[in-house]
Amino acid sequence: MVRRTEYASFLGPPRRRNRDFAGLENRVALRVFVLPALVVGFVAISVWWFALRDDNSAVGGVLTLEDATIPTVLLPSGAAADDAGLLLSGVSLDCEEELTNWTSFQGSITHQGCIKAPTISNPTIEWRIFTGIAGWLNSPLIVGDRVFVASAGRAQGTEDARDGVYAYNLYTGRQEWFFGATLDMNGLGYGNGIIVATGDEGRVWGIDATDGSLIWVETLGVATFGYPLVLEEDNLVVVGDADGVVTAYNLRNGGLLWQRQVDGPIRGGAVSDGEMIVIAGENRDVLAVDKNGTELWRVEVRERDTEGALARIWAAPTIVRDLVVITMLREDTFAEPAITALRKSDGSQVWQAMDIAGIKNEWGSIRSSVAAVGDLLVYGEPYSDRLVALDIETGETAWDVKTGAYCFPHWPSPAVVSGQVIIARHDGAMYAVDIETQTKVWDIYLGNAAGTFPADFDTAGFCEWAPQTGYSVLASPAVAANGYIVVGTLEGYLVAISDRSWG
């Protein structure tokens, strides 16, 4: 269900009966003047056209809104007068940031996940390389012509030779270097030529992005799950660990700058708008600090139907406009989508998501982050086969699109590429949804070596907790400026996707 766009019109209410086209009451005494008036008007226009009009004025060309005589109140309410795309469709496809590299989880330090790049219409696998298991935190980065990814090795939670960080050529998949670790590597961040990595062995590494050599390493003594937040201009790195400790390092040398504490493990990592930093602890504790670590505000986020008892936070927050968007999970389903928006300035609650579109009755636990595009937030809904869009200002559901098989879990966060939402799902496939038409425009299967959908994919119960055939995708995709999409699979392959027409 899609809400209708409200239009303001200068035409007034519909014409009532007994009124003619001139808006006059249907009286005989007045009707006799109508035909002569039309004749006079026609003669006047003819005289202007042939005798008085400026013959040097431009003929043809593009008529802009500044040139048009149509009143701007005919535009959808709130539409920008100079946005032709918005005028035609009523939908904004704009990103709030300009990205040239995918240097962080969901592209940037705000985690909005939106980039302007060529879109794929006929997907193909450009290359496929075994790197080791790509879990929920093993989402790649793309900087220039290089792809960086952390690996959980051949078996998660155990020591093996595949644990570490890899660098690949974006176009060929050729390995450029490998940096080994003792246990699973988790999240990555990039800034000033340095890859920052976290891992299960409780260390934070600064690695030279050019050759994979170690620049610095610091030991926290407890697993670091989340994605490092790298503020490049400030040479600042912020990481969270399993004890809920937030630690800031100097990007260049790993020097300790400050530490803070939140309630519960920090699983998804921190987020920033470049001035403030927001960290969410698993036990609903959300802390905002400045770049010196000084506390700005701290709040406990409570979901409506849990009274704070069971709700937890796993995913990294998203900062967009004046909002900090938090997703949540619990042991049971939610009555409404499990998403809350806080005011960036003070942490007060702005909205909690509501399903006014009537999409479903039981909403699942969300372990992924949202992406932001135009006036929408988009994400993959668990306990479903749906991509869901919310109004960014109200948190109300706007629309949904079927994407693949019905699965209970959902881990990957989406990316938005020039109006296409790219989302991988637990069923092992990746999907593209056109925002303007609200339709799925392509899909591609990543859960096996052949790259073909299993024969039983469309059967009832194919996915549920795990696909009956093939492997899931838990990691989130990265998008290059040339339109390539890169993501890792639970089978252990890193896959680059392009368009067949690109050659």
Regions inferred by a protein language model and the residue ranges of each:
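Aromatic (tryptophan-biased) beta-strands that constitute blades/sheets of beta-rich domains
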Residues: G60-N138, F148, G153, T158-Y166, ...
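Hydrophobic membrane-insertion alpha-helices, especially the h-region
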Residues: V34-V47
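Hydrophobic single-pass membrane-insertion segments
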Residues: S46-V59
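N-terminal intrinsically disordered, acidic low-complexity segments at the extreme N-terminus
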Residues: M1-R19
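Hydrophobic/aromatic beta-strand positions that recur at structurally equivalent sites within the blades
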Residues: Y168, I207, Y249, A288-V289, ...
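Repeat-blade elements of multi-bladed beta-propeller folds
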Residues: E96-I109, I133-V165, F179-W205, E218-T247, ...
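N-terminal Sec-pathway targeting helices
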Residues: L24-A37
